[in-house]
């Protein structure tokens, strides 16, 4: 019996079996394909549709998903759909050196500290009139969180070393692969900042849950890698692409394809041209129940959310499936894998 996400071959064609929950995601704005917003995955289509609906509003947005799932792509699309005339600016908060994080974000006045030889506006002012993506927002140091809260509350920013705040008009989009609510409970992320940032929460699915999109992603990424038109893949190479779990998601796929194009030298891509982990991936086997103590961080978060929604909906699998944007059978599959009994949440 096929399960959601299973890949199979028929003749010269590869197929992926996907179960769809009821309902339509809604049409995306014109030009969405050019932005990279193409998918067969119902959950991802629903996420993009929700972003398109809130784009012209002031509703805050948090993008959640594993590294490489396309959070920056989604934020950039939100910016385009919003119609804001200013620039789109993305910053990886985890890559900001803590001593310089304030000046990088909020700007600095000349002479504020040793080495501040000139005025710098900072990324917040640079994105005024547009959209600022704070990727990995959970990594912000506590002092920076306080100043960011003021920006969101007062629509103004005070550069380091300046007593005079500057008015700004920007939309802040937060993105993270971590559980922000868990960080709040742990005391490492401010509760008031979390409340300010959180409005629409969008979860972007990992590539292993949307293998059906490989047929869209591979040609687009090959063009980006400068592959010759009509580049062919051997059946073994294509089979490996569908078999691999892609733990680092689209970013990993892009690197794998770039390597294969370079090694193929303009000829057909063979299995040996793919990265070793991809070409040596084992054949899929039926998924056995997982010991919760051995789950990855991403699966632990999914299990936690699944339990919370089952509790909220009294064990109603269909309601949980609708809220998560997946098919009912996918919820049943997760329940088996994560050893969660929906019946235990139903009233006696």
PLM regions: where:
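Nucleotide-binding/hydrolysis machinery
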Residues: 66, 75, 82-86, 143-145, ...
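Conserved post-Walker A coupling segment in P-loop NTPases
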Residues: 50-115, 125-141, 169, 206-212, ...
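N-terminal pre-P-loop "Q-motif" helix
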Residues: 36-50, 298
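Bacterial C-terminal helix-turn-helix
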Residues: 9, 255, 290-348
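A short beta-strand-to-loop transition that corresponds to the Sensor-1 phosphate-sensing loop
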Residues: 13, 136, 174-179
């Amino acid at each position: 019996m096929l399960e959601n996400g299973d890949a199979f071959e028929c003749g010269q064609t590869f197929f992926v079996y996907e179960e769809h929950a009821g309902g339509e995601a809604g049409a995306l704005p014109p030009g969405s394909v050019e932005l990279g917003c193409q998918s067969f995955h119902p959950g991802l289509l629903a996420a993009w549709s929700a972003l398109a609906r809130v784009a012209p509003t002031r509703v805050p947005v948090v993008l959640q998903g594993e590294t490489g799932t396309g959070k920056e792509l989604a934020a950039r699309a939100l910016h385009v759909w919003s119609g804001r005339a200013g620039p789109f600016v993305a910053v990886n908060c985890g890559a900001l050196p803590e001593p310089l994080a304030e000046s990088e974000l909020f700007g600095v006045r000349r002479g504020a500290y040793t080495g501040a030889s000139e005025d710098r506006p900072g990324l917040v002012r640079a994105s005024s009139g547009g959209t600022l993506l704070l990727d990995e927002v959970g990594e912000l140091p506590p002092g920076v969180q306080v100043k960011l809260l003021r920006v969101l509350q007062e629509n103004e920013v005070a550069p380091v070393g300046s007593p005079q705040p500057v008015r700004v008009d920007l939309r802040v989009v937060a993105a993270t692969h971590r559980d922000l609510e868990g960080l709040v409970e742990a005391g490492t992320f401010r509760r008031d900042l979390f409340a300010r940032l959180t409005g629409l929460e969008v979860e972007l699915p990992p590539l292993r849950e949307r293998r059906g999109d490989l047929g869209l992603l591979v040609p687009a990424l090959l063009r980006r890698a400068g592959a010759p038109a009509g580049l062919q893949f051997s059946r073994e190479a294509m089979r490996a692409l569908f078999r691999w779990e892609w733990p680092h998601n689209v970013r990993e796929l892009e690197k794998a394809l770039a390597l294969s194009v370079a090694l193929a030298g303009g000829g057909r891509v063979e299995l040996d041209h793919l990265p070793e982990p991809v070409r040596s991936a084992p054949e899929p086997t039926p998924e056995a129940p997982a010991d919760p103590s051995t789950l990855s961080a991403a699966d632990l978060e999914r299990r936690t959310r699944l339990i919370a929604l089952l509790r909220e909906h009294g064990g109603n699998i269909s309601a949980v499936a609708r809220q998560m944007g997946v098919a009912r059978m996918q919820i049943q599959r997760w329940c088996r894998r994560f050893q969660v009994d929906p019946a235990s949440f139903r009233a006696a």
